[in-house]
Amino acid sequence: MTQNYRITLLSGDGIGPEIMAVAVDVLKAVGKQLDLNFEFKEALMGGVAIDATGEPLPEESLQACRDSDAVLLAAIGGYKWDNLPRPERPETGLLALRAGLGLFANRARLLFCPHVLDASSLKREVVEGVDIMVVRELTGGIYFGQPKGIFETETGKNEGSNTMAYGESEIDRIGRVGFETAKKRQGRLCSVDKANVLDVSQLWRDRIMALAADYPEVELSHLYVDNAAMQLVRWPKQFDTIVTGNLFGDILSDAAAMLTGSIGMLPSASLGASGPGVFEPVHGSAPDIAGQDKANPLAQVLSAAMMLRYGLDEPAASDPVEKAVLKVLDWGYPTGDIMSEGMKAVGCRKWGICY
């Protein structure tokens, strides 16, 4: 019997439409093989939505996402909209999407493909075999804490402030996602905070340690965020699963992505307690190469694979997509950003055809 799924596509800006087209072709191919029918619906988000409607996330687009089984997002933002007031910029649409769908946990998987190890800035022996999952809290912390803003002081000069705040329930919720994720992987969880100077991080550490009693099979460790950043570069093999707050996770995910040689290699999944999740590459919209067929679609395709696995509970469809990505690289067909000696660089469209 054919299984039907409604997928909302948010292609967004820059290279977004190019890499989304490849991912959709891949989903159609795997759907045909496994009798899965995907009903794709395009919706506006980001700069293209601002140009068309004046809003980075129109209500119509948010409702389309709510009505779907999963949301596949490509990339948003670009130079064109950088000078808009902050509340009107494309990136605010992403925050609104997460809040509107109740997404509180982001999983970003850092997996080193053996065929492109030489593209990494680190030595092969340092990165070979690395497989890290970063679990990041999405709806709290300094991005959402109040009060925040730019205020005029008594001296007549402006002062900017943001508030980093987490409640016990928020920490417990993301902490359990971290422990459950580690339990299904290698059983090691590293909690990243800044408990030596931040009160909010001390509460974070206290709650994570309290949760550990419910997961005796998981080995728990703690690192301050500055040390964690250093350790990711020094010896990434020590990590299995990392759980951390919104700001720290945002920074560490991007830093870790470049260890692969390109930020175009890192997929992510944003999930809530129920309802559709959002699946997207960690990278941005790369407006400098948009429309030139230079974009790396791997993270978008791997995000589609994460959608199949975590959003639609179709691991039998996710597995062949992930294996096919490795196979195309094994054939020696990378995009230019992960090119190594002996390989032949291909464009975004050609890479999709190779798949």
From Swiss-Prot:
<feature type="binding site">
    <location>
        <position position="98"/>
    </location>
    <ligand>
        <name>substrate</name>
    </ligand>
</feature>
<feature type="binding site">
    <location>
        <position position="226"/>
    </location>
    <ligand>
        <name>Mg(2+)</name>
    </ligand>
</feature>
<feature type="binding site">
    <location>
        <position position="254"/>
    </location>
    <ligand>
        <name>Mg(2+)</name>
    </ligand>
</feature>
<feature type="binding site">
    <location>
        <begin position="78"/>
        <end position="91"/>
    </location>
    <ligand>
        <name>NAD(+)</name>
    </ligand>
</feature>
<keyword id="KW-0479">Metal-binding</keyword>
<feature type="binding site">
    <location>
        <begin position="284"/>
        <end position="296"/>
    </location>
    <ligand>
        <name>NAD(+)</name>
    </ligand>
</feature>
<comment type="function">
    <text>Catalyzes the oxidation of 3-carboxy-2-hydroxy-4-methylpentanoate (3-isopropylmalate) to 3-carboxy-4-methyl-2-oxopentanoate. The product decarboxylates to 4-methyl-2 oxopentanoate.</text>
</comment>
<protein>
    <recommendedName>
        <fullName>3-isopropylmalate dehydrogenase</fullName>
        <ecNumber>1.1.1.85</ecNumber>
    </recommendedName>
</protein>
<feature type="site" description="Important for catalysis">
    <location>
        <position position="194"/>
    </location>
</feature>
<dbReference type="GO" id="GO:0003862">
    <property type="term" value="F:3-isopropylmalate dehydrogenase activity"/>
</dbReference>
<dbReference type="GO" id="GO:0005829">
    <property type="term" value="C:cytosol"/>
</dbReference>
<feature type="binding site">
    <location>
        <position position="226"/>
    </location>
    <ligand>
        <name>substrate</name>
    </ligand>
</feature>
<dbReference type="InterPro" id="IPR024084">
    <property type="entry name" value="IsoPropMal-DH-like_dom"/>
</dbReference>
<keyword id="KW-0520">NAD</keyword>
<keyword id="KW-0100">Branched-chain amino acid biosynthesis</keyword>
<comment type="pathway">
    <text>Amino-acid biosynthesis; L-leucine biosynthesis; L-leucine from 3-methyl-2-oxobutanoate: step 3/4.</text>
</comment>
<keyword id="KW-0432">Leucine biosynthesis</keyword>
<feature type="site" description="Important for catalysis">
    <location>
        <position position="143"/>
    </location>
</feature>
<keyword id="KW-0460">Magnesium</keyword>
<keyword id="KW-0963">Cytoplasm</keyword>
<dbReference type="InterPro" id="IPR004429">
    <property type="entry name" value="Isopropylmalate_DH"/>
</dbReference>
<comment type="similarity">
    <text>Belongs to the isocitrate and isopropylmalate dehydrogenases family. LeuB type 1 subfamily.</text>
</comment>
<dbReference type="InterPro" id="IPR019818">
    <property type="entry name" value="IsoCit/isopropylmalate_DH_CS"/>
</dbReference>
<dbReference type="Pfam" id="PF00180">
    <property type="entry name" value="Iso_dh"/>
</dbReference>
<dbReference type="GO" id="GO:0009098">
    <property type="term" value="P:L-leucine biosynthetic process"/>
</dbReference>
<feature type="binding site">
    <location>
        <position position="136"/>
    </location>
    <ligand>
        <name>substrate</name>
    </ligand>
</feature>
<dbReference type="GO" id="GO:0051287">
    <property type="term" value="F:NAD binding"/>
</dbReference>
<keyword id="KW-0464">Manganese</keyword>
<keyword id="KW-0028">Amino-acid biosynthesis</keyword>
<dbReference type="GO" id="GO:0000287">
    <property type="term" value="F:magnesium ion binding"/>
</dbReference>
<keyword id="KW-0560">Oxidoreductase</keyword>
<comment type="subunit">
    <text>Homodimer.</text>
</comment>
<feature type="binding site">
    <location>
        <position position="250"/>
    </location>
    <ligand>
        <name>Mg(2+)</name>
    </ligand>
</feature>
